[in-house]
Design a protein with these regions (language model features):
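Negatively charged, low-complexity tracts enriched in Asp/Glu with abundant Ser/Thr
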Residues: 1-35, 62-69
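Intrinsic-disorder/low-complexity peptide segments enriched for small residues
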Residues: 2, 18-20, 50, 55, ...
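Short aromatic-glycine-(Arg/Gly/Cys) micro-motifs in beta-strand/loop hairpins
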Residues: 40-65
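A broad, structure-centric signal for solvent-exposed, well-ordered loop/edge residues
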Residues: 8, 29, 39, 50, ...
């Protein structure tokens, strides 16, 4: 197993913009949680063309799966997307 290390990837619970925080949910997956503890969405990482991409995901109860709402070059942009999509 390879560990993904990158300066912009949080390794523990981290504070991010808009009063949200990240909680680890897997090797390349974080829950984005608001101040009240509600899950706003998820951030998933992938490596594409020697660069790291951040995928903003929202769960749709109607179709019972995650939908990608955007791909970003920065973690802050992905979190901002989830903040404004709610």
């Amino acid at each position: 197993m390879t560990a993904l290390t990158h300066p912009s990837i949080p390794t523990t619970t981290s504070a991010v913009p808009h009063g949200l925080r990240l909680v680890g949910a897997g090797t390349r997956l974080w829950r984005v949680v608001d101040r009240a503890g509600r899950v706003v969405g998820h951030i998933q990482t992938s490596e594409e063309a020697d660069a790291l991409r951040f995928h903003a995901l929202r769960y749709s109860a109607r179709i019972r799966r995650f939908l990608e709402v955007g791909r970003f070059w920065s973690l802050d942009d992905a979190v901002s997307c989830l903040h404004y999509v709610r």
